[in-house]
């Protein structure tokens, strides 16, 4: 108050000094006025004095029409005034060619009237929350609305007349602004009428919320049409009205909210009338029978929501006009009222016949003989994908040609066949080793080659070390056991840490098992059924007591080389092969796979052929001795 008085006194003193100085220089009225209008410092002082006078006039009108402003009304007024001043400055930039004292005066008057429109709207909304409304309040509100409506109509009429006579100018902006203010006055007057009717009735008016909702819907639609027409005309005749973007957006958002509220409220009220049951006297006695909306006791006409909260039907109807939630627990009544469609239970299937006691276990699908089946997917959900074992070699596939010359002697042939088998197994192991583990961007080196003299295959490459096992419960102290058993965060963390250690141990163990199985499958490729049968027969023949240890080793190497030779396509027999073996080979090629008798006869012939040079050497050694 003191600051406003000081500013008023200062501006008044400056204005008096400027006018006295101009009159002292010119000594006449007209030259003094011309001097004041041409001097920039004098015009600045006069502008300040004009703003002070407008401020004083506003305080006077506020005292007459509103009395003492409430804190919420003052806060809303200051908040909206800042936006209005910003939009006015943007309008100055758009109409900078029309900038003049008259232009500034018109915008100041527009801002002045906007402030009183906002105050009137807030004061009428206060009627719904005020229990006592005096006749002074009605007189002030009615007189203010009449004054604002008349002034808005006069300024709209003046703007239309100016546009028709002088063409499109800045009056286009003022005309649309005052038209929007007229819609605001209309909305305020309708709300005032509805609140007055509600206050005159003894019981609450149930349909007031419906009328207010449709009033906002109607006036919001008019505002949207006015802003769209204003934007279209301004873009065509002048430029893009940047200052009208924010109010236009607010008008559209308000209209959209009104449409949504109208639709959702009708749906909620329909659900209340059709789906929600009436509260029985037992329900009212079991709970508090005071409606929290109107704070009155519920005797009849109460509805029970899906959340078991009870309210007056009229209170719920007015509540659902604004929001579709329970007043107590804020549950969405529209979502809760949707019927829950439970799926029909499946038809009972006939029980499957019990399996026999000695039923054979079906073999796994797509697993070669001699291979260990892979783990089913999803057994260990925290694992990544691991490379599988290589597929077994197909018997009868063409072998890679070698440049090593074929020796003529039988001993050299046996040695070469043994070396070739070793090289071939090494190459297969190197090629079948996984190139890279999942999750590593670099390529892993191949595992160590298998050696016949090693009793066990080498360990798998890059095998992860086992984590330390968790401490035994018997070795834990009493404090640690109490920490595991206690309630709260520390106990929960201790139990989770113990479970995490067990989980880590299981993952590490299964990872090492998988590495071991992959390495074993890589180093020991499976054999076909024919080779398995031949190996068993050769083992029976070699187990005879008349064969020495050295002969047994030579027979194994020779049998392996003979099997690899017979299984390879396009291989020619050496010169030491007998005519009987050629006939047997031709019969096998004509008839397909040989029978068991043919295999036995072939093995015996090979043994005789292999043992003959050894007996000759023994006779030569005996004759020399």
Curated annotation (Swiss-Prot):
Lumenal side, ranges? 26-40, 120-135, 191-212
Residues involved in Zn(2+) 1 binding: 291, 294, 312, 315
- Identify the SUPFAM superfamilies for this entry: RING/U-box (SSF57850)
Q: How does it sit in the membrane?
A: Multi-pass membrane protein
Transmembrane segments annotated in the record for this chain: 5-25, 41-61, 99-119, 136-156, 170-190, 213-235
UniProt keyword Phosphoprotein, yes or no: no
- Which positions form S-S bridges? none
What's the record's remark on domains?
The RING-type zinc finger is required for E3 ligase activity.
**Spans annotated as Disordered:** 337-361, 390-434, 462-487, 523-625
Cellular compartment(s): Endoplasmic reticulum membrane
Q: Name the Enzyme Commission number(s) assigned to this protein.
A: 2.3.2.27
Reaction(s) catalysed (UniProt annotation): S-ubiquitinyl-[E2 ubiquitin-conjugating enzyme]-L-cysteine + [acceptor protein]-L-lysine = [E2 ubiquitin-conjugating enzyme]-L-cysteine + N(6)-ubiquitinyl-[acceptor protein]-L-lysine
Bias (Polar residues) occurs at 523-564
- Gene Ontology terms, MF aspect: ubiquitin protein ligase activity; zinc ion binding
Name under which the protein is recorded:
E3 ubiquitin-protein ligase synoviolin
> GO biological process: what's one of them?
proteasome-mediated ubiquitin-dependent protein catabolic process
- Binding of Zn(2+) 2, residues: 307, 309, 326, 329
What SMART domains does the database record attribute to this sequence?
RING
Complex formation: Homodimer.
């Amino acid at each position: 108050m003191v600051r406003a008085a000081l500013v008023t006194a200062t501006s008044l003193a400056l204005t008096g000094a400027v006018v006295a100085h101009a009159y002292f220089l010119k000594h006449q009225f007209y030259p003094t006025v011309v001097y004041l209008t041409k001097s920039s410092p004098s015009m600045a002082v006069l502008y300040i004095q004009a703003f002070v006078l407008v401020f004083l006039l506003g305080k006077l009108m506020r005292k007459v029409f509103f009395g003492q402003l409430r804190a919420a009304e003052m806060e809303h007024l200051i908040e909206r005034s800042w936006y209005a001043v910003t939009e006015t400055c943007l309008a100055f930039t758009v109409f900078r060619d029309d900038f003049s004292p008259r232009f500034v005066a018109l915008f100041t008057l527009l801002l002045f009237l906007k402030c009183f429109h906002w105050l009137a709207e807030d004061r009428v909304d206060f009627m719904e929350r005020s229990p006592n409304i005096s006749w002074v309040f009605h007189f002030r509100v009615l007189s203010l609305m009449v004054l604002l409506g008349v002034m808005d109509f006069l300024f709209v009429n003046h703007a239309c007349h100016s546009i028709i006579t002088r063409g499109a100018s800045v009056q286009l902006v003022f005309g649309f602004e005052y038209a929007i203010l007229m819609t605001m006055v209309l909305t305020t007057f309708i709300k005032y009428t509805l609140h007055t009717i509600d206050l005159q009735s003894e019981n609450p008016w149930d349909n007031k919320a419906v009328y207010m909702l449709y009033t906002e819907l109607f006036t919001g639609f008019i505002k949207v049409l006015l802003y769209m027409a204003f934007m279209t005309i301004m873009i065509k005749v002048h430029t893009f009205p940047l200052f009208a973007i924010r109010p236009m957006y607010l008008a559209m958002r308000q209209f959209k909210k009104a449409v949504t509220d109208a639709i959702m409220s009708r749906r909620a009220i329909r659900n209340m009338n059709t789906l929600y049951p009436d509260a029985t006297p037992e329900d009212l006695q079991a709970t508090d029978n005071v409606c929290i909306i109107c704070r009155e006791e519920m005797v009849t006409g109460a509805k029970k929501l899906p959340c078991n909260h009870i309210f007056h039907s009229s209170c719920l109807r007015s509540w659902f006009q604004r929001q579709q939630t329970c007043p107590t627990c804020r549950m969405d009544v529209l979502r809760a009222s949707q019927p829950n469609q439970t799926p029909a239970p499946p038809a009972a299937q006939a029980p499957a016949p019990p399996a026999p006691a000695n039923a054979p276990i079906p073999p796994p699908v797509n697993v070669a003989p001699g291979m260990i089946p892979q783990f089913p997917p999803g057994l260990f959900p925290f694992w990544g994908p691991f490379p599988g074992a290589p597929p077994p070699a197909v018997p009868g596939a063409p072998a890679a040609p070698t440049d090593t010359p074929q020796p003529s002697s039988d001993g050299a042939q046996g040695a070469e066949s043994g070396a070739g088998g070793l090289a071939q197994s090494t190459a297969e192991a190197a090629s079948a080793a996984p190139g890279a583990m999942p999750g590593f961007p670099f390529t892993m080196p191949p595992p160590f080659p298998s050696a016949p003299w090693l009793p066990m295959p080498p360990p798998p490459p890059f095998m992860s070390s086992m984590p330390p096992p968790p401490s035994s419960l018997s070795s834990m102290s009493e404090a640690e056991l109490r920490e595991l058993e206690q309630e709260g965060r520390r106990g929960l963390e201790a139990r989770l840490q113990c479970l995490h250690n067990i989980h880590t141990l299981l993952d590490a163990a299964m990872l090492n098992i998988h590495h071991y199985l992959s390495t074993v499958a890589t180093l020991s490729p499976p054999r076909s059924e024919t080779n398995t049968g031949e190996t068993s027969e050769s083992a029976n023949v070699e187990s005879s007591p008349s064969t020495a240890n050295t002969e047994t080793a030579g027979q194994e190497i020779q049998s392996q080389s003979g099997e690899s030779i017979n299984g390879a396509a396009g291989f020619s027999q050496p010169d030491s092969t007998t005519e009987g073996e050629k006939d047997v080979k031709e019969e096998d090629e004509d008839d397909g796979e040989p029978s068991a008798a043919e295999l036995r006869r072939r093995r015996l012939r090979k043994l005789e052929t292999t043992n003959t040079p050894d007996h000759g050497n023994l006779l030569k050694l005996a004759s020399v001795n």
